[in-house]
Curated annotation (Swiss-Prot):
Protein name: Aspartyl/glutamyl-tRNA(Asn/Gln) amidotransferase subunit B 1
Organism: Clostridium acetobutylicum (strain ATCC 824 / DSM 792 / JCM 1419 / IAM 19013 / LMG 5710 / NBRC 13948 / NRRL B-527 / VKM B-1787 / 2291 / W)
UniProt key word Oxidoreductase: no
Catalytically driven reaction(s): L-glutamyl-tRNA(Gln) + L-glutamine + ATP + H2O = L-glutaminyl-tRNA(Gln) + L-glutamate + ADP + phosphate + H(+); L-aspartyl-tRNA(Asn) + L-glutamine + ATP + H2O = L-asparaginyl-tRNA(Asn) + L-glutamate + ADP + phosphate + 2 H(+)
Gene: gatB1
Alphabetical UniProt keywords: ATP-binding, Ligase, Nucleotide-binding, Protein biosynthesis
């Protein structure tokens, strides 16, 4: 029996406003617990909310970037939820009149074909606080309570976990590009819940739906969806009755666990928020925001491929965040070597950022300095191997590559006589490798070149080493 997976995603993106959704408290991440609070976001009796216009602007901007229709009449509603991280026992959100509807994101599938994933709606709302569970009990931090969110609800159009991750990557890239959210998953500013069901291939009715929460990375989303797909199939084939429920992904155990039965809309007892006015959004407002939308990621990808001649894969990776795309574009233009700029950013620099938990905007060096390093390598002043050491020093100190090379004595040695002596020395110490070469084992050339580079501490010009090594081997 063949089965088909049906996936829909609910993405919560914290909007990049300076203040909270319904009060003037800072929306900045972090801070000492319960210091970014006031009577409004704490839900104290008599405290009245007022809506953050910038949050509405950002919601509209997200909708336009995702090809949505923007409502002209929007309304805020109360959604009743009884959790300790929401002190007023209701969330101010949108129910019947969301800000944006009927959009789509176009993604590229693994076979190169394009597919449109529908965006059912985008509504704006407030975030909840955080619960910290300890051995002594549960602590509540209300700093995040009231931070503006855009909830982006997809249609159930995805048919594989890989499609879901591709959709998320493109969504993150778009939101980052238009500047409505920084999309930092490790800070909780981009969170995703998944709804999954499994049905027999060709069936017209979806199966029993499961919601999955607590997925803190795109990798976790893919793993959780694959796990649930297998769990549903096993249940169907064994005759087990599935129930609509919410489950939590456990990253340590690589499995989901039950949280609670899945609520329906009527469980939340929605009704209009009487303390806030209706949103009246005219065409002039919408068009003024449309004019601020920059070049979108798919447009930037196409331009990078055409203008800089880089592969499609490179363009896709470099445009995942706009800060990375901007850094690349500046470096490519200044250095005149787009492929080297791409290789450095996707390779060593991304590795350094990952190991040190920093973003590209946190780097101490600039596109101008990276361009200088690329030029020094291309001119033969230093080898690519030395360049890898220089980039680490640039990250640590912010110094220019030229200064680092001079201070560390890293200038490349291109003196053929000196290099030839070292080549002969290496060959005299590795007679077996010479015999292997004579017997057609050409791989030993790389091994021998590596020994020369080791003796010169990476300073020998690799092109000269390669030429001299082959010449000497052929003389043996």
């Amino acid at each position: 029996m063949e089965y088909e997976i049906v996936i829909g995603l609910e993405v919560h993106a914290e909007l990049a406003t300076k203040t909270k959704m319904y009060c003037g408290c800072t929306a900045e991440f972090g801070g000492q617990p319960n210091t970014h609070v006031c009577p409004v976001c704490m839900g104290l009796p008599g405290a009245l909310p007022h809506i953050n216009k910038r949050a509405v602007d950002y919601g509209i901007k997200a909708g336009l970037a995702l090809n949505c229709s923007i409502t002209h009449i929007g309304r805020m509603d109360r959604k009743h939820i009884f959790y300790p991280d929401n002190s007023r026992n209701y969330q101010i959100t949108q129910d019947e009149l969301p800000l944006c509807t009927n959009g789509y994101i176009e993604i590229e599938l693994e076979d190169g074909s394009k597919k449109k994933i529908g965006v059912e709606r985008i509504h704006i709302e407030e975030d909840a606080g955080k619960l910290l569970h300890t051995n002594a009990g549960t602590l509540v931090d209300f700093n995040r309570c009231g931070v503006p969110l855009a909830e982006i609800v997809s249609k159930p159009d995805m048919r594989s976990p890989r499609e879901a991750v591709t959709y998320l990557e493109e969504l993150k890239s778009i939101l980052s590009c238009v500047g409505v959210s920084d999309c930092k998953m490790e800070e909780g500013s981009l969170r995703c819940d998944a709804n999954i069901s499994v049905m027999k291939k060709g069936a017209k009715e979806f199966g029993v739906r499961t919601e999955i929460k607590n997925m803190n990375s795109f990798k976790a989303v893919e793993k959780a969806l694959n796990y649930e797909y297998e769990r549903h199939i096993k249940a169907i084939e064994s005759g087990e009755k599935l129930t609509q429920e919410t489950r939590r992904w456990d990253d340590a155990k690589n499995e989901t666990a039950p949280m609670r039965s899945k609520e329906e809309a009527n469980d939340y007892r929605y009704f209009p928020e009487g303390d806030l006015v209706t949103l009246n959004i005219d065409d002039e407002w919408i068009e003024s925001i449309r004019k601020t939308i920059p070049e979108l990621p798919y447009q930037k990808r196409e331009r990078f491929i055409k203008e800089f001649g880089i592969p499609k894969y490179d363009a896709s990776v470099l445009t995942l965040t706009m800060s990375m795309a901007d850094f690349f574009e500046k470096t490519a233009k200044i250095s005149g070597d787009a492929k080297s700029a791409s290789n450095w950013l996707m390779g060593d620099i991304s590795k350094i950022m990952k190991e040190n938990y920093v973003w590209i905007e946190d780097l101490k060096f600039t596109p101008e300095q990276l361009s200088e390093l690329i030029k020094l390598i291309n001119e033969g002043t230093v080898s690519n191997a030395i360049g890898k050491k220089v980039i680490i020093k640039m990250f640590e100190t912010g110094k220019s590559p030229k200064n680092i090379i001079e201070e560390e004595g890293l200038i490349q040695n291109s003196n053929e006589d000196e290099i030839l002596n070292i080549v002969k020395e290496v060959l005299s110490e590795n007679e077996k490798s010479i015999e292997d070469y004579k017997n057609g084992k050409n791989r030993v050339v790389g091994f021998l070149i590596g020994l020369v580079m080791k003796k010169t501490k990476g300073k020998a010009n690799p092109k000269i080493v390669n030429k001299l090594m082959i010449d000497e081997l052929n003389k043996q």
